[in-house]
Amino acid sequence: MKTLIVAALFCTIGMALADDTPPPPPFLAGAPQDVVKAFFELLKKDETKTDPEIEKDLDAWVDTLGGDYKAKFETFKKEMKAKEAELAKAHEEAVAKMTPEAKKADAELSKIAEDDSLNGIQKAQKIQAIYKTLPQSVKDELEKGIGPAVPQ
């Protein structure tokens, strides 16, 4: 679920900068444009909230939609949990191959990303602050092993 929230927030930020509309999440495929727009507006409004607060707001919002949106959303959440488990396993495998310095940096960055007391903006700021202090070799290793740690 956190993956959805983070991805949707980056899409929303990108959408605001590029004035493009990102595709809707799978549970809103085929939904009227006003419903999709309301989804992205909710995320934009919630950008200063923590992940648990956003999840609560999303659950409440989906409940208001009626129809089969609730069932699609529940299926989507289950799929996201499975995807998160796959990503966590791949992350563990990548980290196992890293140098001690990169492992330490990854642990610091992961701790921030998983901190439910921080909102997305706070997480991004803290991650960027740490990332800027890392030696280039560690940044390269992190990006090679797990992808960019800081949104470009």
UniProtKB/Swiss-Prot annotation:
Belongs to the SXP/RAL-2 family. Resistant to heat. Pfam families: ANIS5_cation-bd (PF02520). Residues 1-18 form the signal peptide. This is SXP/RAL-2 family protein Ani s 5. Residues 127-146 are annotated as: IgE-binding and IgG4-binding. Excretory gland, ventriculus, and the luminal epithelium of the intestine of the larvae. Residues 25-42, 49-54, 58-66, 103-120 are annotated as: Necessary for IgE-binding. Residues 49-68, 118-137 are annotated as: IgG4-binding. Its main location: secreted. One of its GO terms (molecular function) is IgG binding. It comes from Anisakis simplex (Herring worm). Keywords: Allergen, IgE-binding protein, IgG-binding protein, Secreted, Signal.
